[in-house]
Each structure stands twice: as C-alpha cells, then as structure tokens.
C-alpha cells in the first residue's frame, strides 16, 4: 500500500505542471493588468503589463 500511495500523487503533480497554458498562468497579474487596461487604457498600465510579462517569463514562457 505505501507504494501505491506514493506513486499516485507524483504523476498527477507533474502532469498538472507541464501543460500550463499562457491563459492560465499568473492569474493575479493578468487580472490586475486587464482591469487597468479596461478602466484607464493601455498607455496608463505599463507597470502592470511589465509585471505580468515578468511573471510569465518566470514560468518559462517566452514573451
């Protein structure tokens, strides 16, 4: 039984991390960026846009 319990969580953890899509990455920075763009316009949200790009890069996305 210990082998079964140890084997089950490992594959699901690695499977969940590998197929991370850009749309699902960095939800906090994405939400703040989008809200700012809608309310103030893109030209006033450069700092939030950059923060989201940095978060995406940290997760391995090439932006």
From Swiss-Prot:
One of its GO terms (molecular function) is copper chaperone activity. Keywords: Acetylation, Chaperone, Copper, Cytoplasm, Disulfide bond, Metal-binding, Mitochondrion, Phosphoprotein. Copper metallochaperone essential for the assembly of the mitochondrial respiratory chain complex IV (CIV), also known as cytochrome c oxidase. Binds two copper ions and delivers them to the metallochaperone SCO1 which transports the copper ions to the Cu(A) site on the cytochrome c oxidase subunit II (MT-CO2/COX2). The gene is COX17. Residues 1-21 are annotated as: Disordered. InterPro entries: Cys_alpha_HP_mot_SF (IPR009069), Cyt_c_oxidase_Cu-chaperone (IPR007745). A motif (Cx9C motif 2) lies at residues 45-55. The modification Phosphoserine is found at residue 14. Interacts with COA1. Interacts with the chaperone CHCHD4; this is important for correct folding and the formation of disulfide bonds that stabilize the structure. Cu cation binds at residues 23-24. Gene3D superfamilies: CytochromE C oxidase copper chaperone (1.10.287.1130). Belongs to the COX17 family. This is Cytochrome c oxidase copper chaperone. SUPFAM superfamilies: Cysteine alpha-hairpin motif. One of its GO terms (biological process) is mitochondrial cytochrome c oxidase assembly. A motif (Cx9C motif 1) lies at residues 26-36. Acetylation by KAT8 promotes assembly of the mitochondrial respiratory chain complex IV (CIV).
């Amino acid at each position: 039984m210990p082998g079964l319990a140890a084997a089950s969580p490992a594959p699901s953890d690695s499977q969940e991390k590998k197929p991370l899509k850009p749309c699902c990455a960095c939800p906090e920075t994405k939400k703040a960026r989008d809200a700012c763009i809608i309310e103030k316009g893109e030209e006033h949200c450069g700092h939030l846009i950059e923060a989201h790009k940095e978060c995406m890069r940290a997760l391995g996305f090439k932006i």
